[in-house]
Amino acid sequence: MFYCIFHLRCLGTLLFYLCAMKLQLDFPKIDAPKLKETDIIFGLGSCFGNEVSQQLLQAFIPGMCNPFGTIFHPIPMAQQLNRIMENSPFTPQDFETEQGSFFSYFSHTLLRGTSLEAVQKNHNQQLANANTILLKSTKLILTFGTNWGFQLGETGEWVSNCQKQPAALFNREFAGGEENSQHWIKTLQTLFAVNPGIEVIVTVSPVRHIKDGLSENNKSKAALITLVHQLVATFPNQVFYMPSYEVILDVLRDYRFFADDLCHINSLGLQCIMDWLQKEWFSPNMLSYWKAAKKVQNLFDHRVVSSNFLEIEQLERKKNQLVAEFNSRYHRFI
């Protein structure tokens, strides 16, 4: 009897300490102006940043993300932003050709084409749209992916995308801290001159680039985090750090939140990020807007399997009514 009571007390003590133990770090605060439902966003950067921005755009927040495709290195990213601000049109000299295909090292392979005229026109349309939206934007979301990048061997020019060209054409380089900061300080000074009210949210992608090993990946991420903090210190009232990198790698710390390659973030990890943003970054009105937008989005995503005409008509009326109410309340045009 005494033996059983002793062990029950030990078990109770163990459970008490287990319950009292802290097994996860707290989610970090976001020291940045709240996201409002009236904001216009412009996203630029890696695939992780693209996924976050797309979540906002799909919720009918006006804006644009990566008009020239995903981009990972901070210097080509600054070059893209500068060209968008300048609205400097593309000319035929901006494009290369390979086996009847035309492309630019400035943009993603998705913008390639077999007609130089069509490719140039597409680039200039994207450029004009991006310029218009950027100058109206209230939030710029930048996501740096890696500090390893590529320069053209002949000119030393940083490229946004190697366009699957032979490796011999490029030099793979690790950008210096001063080079990164000089590019971005100058770029942001220009941005704040043409759009004084814009707020810049900068984050570092938690996606691992492990081609050269974990040590090189960590070296790269450290350089990017250093750059971000330099920019925040230089523009303390206009540039803000969003610690999504720390959320994935320091708070969650679990491969359940990664894809099968153990490098990219999966849908569960992205959902954790969005839940964190809702709690820490969304204004109260934005949170209400988000819930309403999700209802509308779910209606659009809903696939009708019924063949009953009356049921289909009823669902269509419900959707139209909900969309009309949403548009009227939030001044949208869905």
Where are these regions (language model features)?
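Short, positively charged and aromatic/hydrophobic N-terminal segments
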Residues: Y3-I5, F16-Y17
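Extracellular glycan-modifying ectodomains
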Residues: G12, Y17-I334
